[in-house]
């Protein structure tokens, strides 16, 4: 582990979107956290995702269960590792989803409309 990894909370495991989807289907205890801004979810989100924008993340960690595996996802895979590192530092069992919702959609995986987002904007 490099110095930067140590300062940022250590390395976080990363999986692709297909593996994330398999985990969500196989284990109903897995929580997926979407760290995008609400406006970014207008085009849809991963089914069952909990929306906690990265800008609010530190103050909202208590909303997440400490006894369940957590996946983090964002739009393209740049913000979710930051959230994952925060979770790891706080003692959560966390895995980052590479490629974000762009890769999720490209893979043809299910997307759902977020409540309250229809026709926005």
Residue ranges, per PLM feature:
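Conserved G/P- and acidic residue-centered "switch" motifs that form tight phosphate/ATP-binding loops
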Residues: 34, 77
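Rhodanese-like catalytic fold shared by cysteine-dependent sulfurtransferases
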Residues: 1-30, 38-69, 80-121
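Short, surface-exposed ligand- or partner-binding patches at beta-edge/loop junctions that are enriched
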Residues: 73
């Amino acid at each position: 582990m490099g110095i930067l990894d140590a300062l940022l909370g250590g390395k976080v495991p990363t999986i692709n979107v297909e593996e994330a989807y398999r985990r969500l289907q196989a284990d109903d205890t897995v929580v997926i956290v979407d760290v995008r801004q609400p406006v970014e979810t207008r085009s849809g989100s991963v089914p069952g995702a909990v929306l906690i924008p990265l800008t609010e993340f530190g103050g909202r960690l208590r909303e997440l269960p400490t006894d369940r595996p957590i996946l983090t996802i964002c739009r393209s895979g740049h913000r979710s590792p930051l959230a994952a590192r925060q979770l790891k530092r706080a003692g959560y069992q966390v895995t980052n989803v590479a490629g974000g919702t762009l890769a999720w959609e490209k893979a043809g995986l299910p997307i759902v409309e977020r409540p309250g987002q229809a026709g926005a904007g």
